Amino acid sequence: MLAAAGRLIHSKGDEFTTQELCAEAGVALQTFYRYFASKDELLLAVIGDAMNDACEYWTESAAELPDALARLRYFITSTLARLDGDGRDAATARFIVSTRWRLHRNYAKELAEAEKPFVDLLRAEVNAAVDAGLLNPPDPEWDPWFIAELARSVFHYYAFAEHAEGELEVVKEKLWRFCLTALGGSLEP
């Protein structure tokens, strides 16, 4: 059902019915309600699944980077990569933002749990960078959450804002410099 929901999201955003989802998934409506109490619960599961997939992808992609600081930079700036893609990526980004805000009103704790893998990914690299003497954050337990929220805020803005070619690369650099400074890291001269 999650794969079927993903296909419908790419074609319709969240403007699909549970009946359309069941038809796409090839399951009965009763089967849907056996797993999910509502469409919103399905969307939370889709977000959680997408977050897990993204974190796995980023972890694999960053495996060859030289140190925790390079991996942390990659993880933070990669959150904006989809914004510089084709029309389908832009539509997906807008869906993520609008759906996330709508779900946040009624499912704040569940949404935080679905997004926790990204915070955990950042926390692991912050701690590894601290152990390597590369960072000195004021609060290594909480700071990754604040960084995730900042990256999300930038993503939300640029999902809807027009931007010039190359602008996102500048934004990624500025986001990284801000986060590095906030974590007690030093900027290279």
What is the meaning of each model-derived region?
Residues 4-8, 24, 31, 78, ...:
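Amphipathic alpha-helical interface segments
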Residues 53, 82-86, 150-157, 178-186:
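Phosphate/oxyanion-binding loops and surfaces in catalytic or ligand/nucleic-acid-binding neighborhoods
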